[in-house]
Amino acid sequence: LMKNEKLYFTQEIDEDVIDYVRNTPTCQNVVRQGNIIYVTKIPYMAKKYFREKDPKLKRYYYCHCPWVREAIKSDIKISSNFCYCSAGYEKRPWDVIFNQPVKAYVLETVLKGDLVCKFAIHIPEEYSKISRQLKGKRVNKSRLET
């Protein structure tokens, strides 16, 4: 993508963007700790975000939500609860995977002055129990094949 100067989901990609994704395990991937899955959004305007020094503009370039970006730009205070919309977006695939609604929480958000948006997705208890039972056990792959 970088060599061909093509956009990736409307974004220019350069080494700074690649380094960020590579060095932030929760970005574009997930990290599981216990029964919680952590997710960090990738900056919306990544190249501008990485080059920006002003914290306000950095938050502006980070956010995917046009309403929040305009609030940041215009110095309009809105509740960080507004970011539960993004938490809903992040949790939706997990609702499908676990075949039930999961709980999602906003841990960090540009609306609270953070420079990233990070979410916690709670794994349903019955799936946590299964993983605890399997922990340390070998799985016979032939039994998993259909």
What kind of feature is each model-predicted range?
Residues 63-65, 83-86, 117:
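Disulfide-bonded cysteines in secreted/extracellular proteins and peptides
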Residues 83-105:
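Conserved short secondary-structure elements within globular domains
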Residues 22-23, 34, 74-75, 88, ...:
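N-terminal, helix-rich and Lys/Arg-enriched segments in bacterial and organellar proteins
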Residues 1-79:
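Amphipathic interaction/junction segments at domain boundaries or subunit interfaces
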Residues 48, 81, 100-146:
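Short terminal or interdomain "cap/linker" segment that borders an active site or interface and mediates
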